[in-house]
Amino acid sequence: MKPVYWLLPGLLLGIPTFAQSVPEPPSVAAAELGTDLRYLSNCLQQGQFAAVDSLLATQSREQREYLLLQLLRNINVTRPASPELHAWVAAQADKAPRWLVEQRVDGFLVQQPAYDFAAQARLLLGQWQQLAWQADYRQQLEQGTFGFKSIYYRGNPELARQQEALLQALEQLPVSLLQRESRTLAAQNIYLPDNRLLSYLLQRTGEPALYSRLWRQPVDQDALAALATINSFHQGNEASELLIAASTNPHLKEPALRQLSALSPLPQQARSYLLGELANRQYGSLVADLLMEVDEPLLLSALAKRLGQHDQNPMTPTLFPDSGTPERRPGL
């Protein structure tokens, strides 16, 4: 395999860059390098980083980058790294792979690393950072010192990754601590980029105050999943109040009405609300269909009376004031 020396900028810099005009990345026979790889892995496990670097320096550029990639892939990321291993991996992340191959992308030939060990090193560093955040958050949560505002603020470039670490930390806590954190979060006016945190806590605790916070958020699939948990944690008047409150959000109104009508027995508050919604020009037909499925004679009688009035007198805003729901049914 003969490398091609690029004169510029390679010779000017004194470090030639290698490339090959082949459609597939070059293949180094793994069997030939297996002994070296096992030796390198053993040295790495024992913290002998100088020995690792010395052996790699004796290899050809292609073999060195291949071995580096395999070595980094074999590192265990299920536990935090030692400071020395972290520093060694960070040093690899700062290097630029120089054994390149040409590949056709969208009709153009582009040069790409054959063995991108630097990208693998950056991946390891990111995974270790996640573990470190997770451990810190768990300790703070257990001690009652965690502050949601330390993560949730506008402009935080690490918000998505830190939220993922927080959710992993919460997964390891008992329900009693989750209930405490749910009440703390409900009392705070902080920025939330989505409803993942609210949905997770509600699916574990059913904290009523947290539902109220959720109804004020933009609706997404996590909000719908959290709405569905109400009937699992609450019954009777409490469930009725939560679902009626949810129905004030136009994007939650239809699923909230469906859940409300499914309460059994149906609380008086829910009956009155649903009968009142018959006058809603947007949702009246849906509510009528839902009420006809309810096995309660008194409610069915009231429904028949309302529908009879509707047949005799066309529904108008004067007879049946609109509940204030928008004219168009929004999509979920």
Where are the language model's segments positioned?
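N-terminal Sec/ER secretory leader and immediately downstream segment
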Residues: V22-L170, E181, R306
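Hydrophilic extracytoplasmic domains
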Residues: I244-L332
